Amino acid sequence: MQRLEELIQDHPDTANAIGAPGRDWMTYGDLKVLTLNVRQALRAAGIGAQDRVAIVLPNGPEMAAAFVTVAQSATTAPLNLAYKEDEFAFYLEDLKAKAIIVETGYDGPARRVAKRFDMIVIELTASNPAGSFTLST
């Protein structure tokens, strides 16, 4: 069975990987670079391979890219952005997540629960091409 990283490495750098209507395609080369950048950002935030990271983002190319890249550096748990505060509290506590990734500027129930649980909050800022982003704490 191949690991996710191996599956990505098997594609030519110029091949399209992630797209969205009206946006440029992210290539596999872009995805490989993003994977390294995400790993560096997570390690700088104190997140290791055995840690759990919840992702609370709208469906779309950034969610897809975040899942694929974070999963290569930590255990990843995508959560539904529509959850209410008590649902986030249940899932984040059950997961024992060390960190949560949210969109820059998001101030909803997931962030409030993460702060209550003293989790690391990582903000994702989308850019171009589709799926591309930066992370900051």
Predicted regions and their residues:
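A short N-terminal helical cap/helix-turn-helix that marks the beginning
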Residues: 1-17
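Conserved AMP-binding/adenylate-forming core of the ANL superfamily
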Residues: 16-60, 64-68, 84-89, 137
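Alpha-helix N-cap/helix-start capping motif
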Residues: 12, 60-61, 104
